[in-house]
């Protein structure tokens, strides 16, 4: 896929998890941004510890790269528990989940990434495990098959997903805590970049960190990736210190503009404007026009463009906004100007 080569792709690339782990916060005190989530989790974790209970099962959702795995690690660390990690696509059979859960110790945190991709068979097994800490397993086949119940120790399930709408109601309803991660503001991202630079031994001033933050699409994973590339540029083209000017030169070289857009974003916006007259246009037609999959547009490209006000999602399809036209120095259609007038 084309977007896998994007430096601003919010999904983790191969080997990147190991690199990111080195700069990942280990506690809520180190956790930057997401103030509502941080405050709520401090209360929920503190209360569970005071009672001597496991934390309620927790669902974390939001766009990729915002720290869902990081939050799962922090929950385990704050609870003084071990973290066992897996993902929805890996758990193909009921036996896969049973093998994992029978090895849990009291208080353990089980993290299932991409939980929306669990198979229905595995999901059915998960219900009694979450609700009653029991595992129903079928032994044998055919008429001789019988069900046995296994008692599980109290544990906390942390589920992560980028597509909460795909979760079934029975699964979603079994989570006592539901947290949505939002895109980060520039101030918080600047602090994240400065912290990562310090841990990586990169000489960087605050204006340099802010320049990287501005182009990181509100996403810490992208910020850390851009930081590594800017560091490389500074070491080869300068004295190794990342200033605003060095960051600007490096990011321009990488074709990441002042809004954090790359060639894919610009292509999507220009296709919407030039081929479809600014819209509205259906997402399938848009996907065909740029030779991408529908899921790529909905999960990778659109969220940030919508959040920044460059695209509108309407019942009739996607539409380019005034900001999109202005970004490319194009004349804004009269209809868009009229729609934006007060009282219209």
Curated annotation (Swiss-Prot):
Highest rank taxon of the organism: Bacteria
Substrates-to-products reaction catalysed: ATP + H2O = ADP + phosphate + H(+)
Subcellular compartments: Cytoplasm
Span list, region Small ATPAse domain (RuvB-S): 185-255
Entry keywords, A to Z: ATP-binding, Cytoplasm, DNA damage, DNA recombination, DNA repair, DNA-binding, Hydrolase, Nucleotide-binding
Residues reported to bind DNA: 294, 313, 318
Recorded domain comment: Has 3 domains, the large (RuvB-L) and small ATPase (RuvB-S) domains and the C-terminal head (RuvB-H) domain. The head domain binds DNA, while the ATPase domains jointly bind ATP, ADP or are empty depending on the state of the subunit in the translocation cycle. During a single DNA translocation step the structure of each domain remains the same, but their relative positions change.
Assembly notes: Homohexamer. Forms an RuvA(8)-RuvB(12)-Holliday junction (HJ) complex. HJ DNA is sandwiched between 2 RuvA tetramers; dsDNA enters through RuvA and exits via RuvB. An RuvB hexamer assembles on each DNA strand where it exits the tetramer. Each RuvB hexamer is contacted by two RuvA subunits (via domain III) on 2 adjacent RuvB subunits; this complex drives branch migration. In the full resolvosome a probable DNA-RuvA(4)-RuvB(12)-RuvC(2) complex forms which resolves the HJ.
Name of this chain's protein: Holliday junction branch migration complex subunit RuvB
């Amino acid at each position: 896929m084309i977007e896998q080569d994007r430096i601003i792709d919010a999904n983790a690339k191969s080997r990147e998890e190991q690199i990111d782990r080195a700069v990942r916060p280990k506690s809520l005190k180190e956790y930057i941004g997401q103030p509502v989530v941080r405050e709520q989790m401090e209360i929920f974790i503190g209360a569970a510890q005071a009672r001597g209970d496991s934390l309620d099962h927790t669902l974390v959702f939001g766009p990729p790269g915002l720290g869902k795995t990081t939050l799962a690690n922090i929950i385990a660390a704050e609870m003084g528990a071990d973290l066992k990690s897996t993902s929805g696509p890996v758990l193909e059979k009921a036996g896969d989940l049973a093998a994992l859960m029978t090895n849990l110790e009291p208080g353990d945190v089980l993290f299932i990434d991409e939980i929306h991709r669990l198979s229905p068979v595995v999901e059915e097994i998960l219900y009694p495990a979450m609700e009653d800490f029991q595992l129903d397993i079928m032994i044998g086949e055919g008429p001789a098959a019988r069900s046995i119940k296994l008692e599980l120790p109290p544990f906390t399930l942390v589920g992560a997903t980028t597509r909460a709408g795909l979760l079934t109601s029975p699964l979603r309803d079994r989570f006592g805590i539901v947290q949505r991660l939002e895109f980060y503001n520039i101030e918080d991202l600047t602090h994240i970049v400065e912290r990562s630079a310090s841990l990586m031994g990169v000489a960087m001033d605050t204006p340099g960190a802010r320049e990287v933050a501005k182009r990181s699409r509100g996403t810490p994973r992208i910020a850390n990736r851009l930081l590594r590339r800017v560091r490389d540029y500074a070491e080869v083209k300068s004295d190794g210190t990342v200033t605003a000017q060095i960051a600007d030169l490096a990011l321009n070289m990488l074709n990441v503009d002042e809004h954090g857009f790359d060639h894919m974003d610009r292509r999507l916006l220009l296709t919407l404007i030039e081929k479809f007259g600014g819209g509205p246009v259906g997402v399938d037609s848009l996907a065909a026009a740029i030779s991408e999959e529908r899921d790529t547009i909905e999960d990778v490209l659109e969220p940030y463009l919508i959040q920044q006000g460059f695209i509108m999602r309407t019942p009739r399809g996607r539409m380019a906004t005034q900001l999109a036209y202005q970004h490319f120095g194009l004349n804004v259609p009269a209809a868009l100007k009229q729609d934006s007038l007060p009282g219209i």
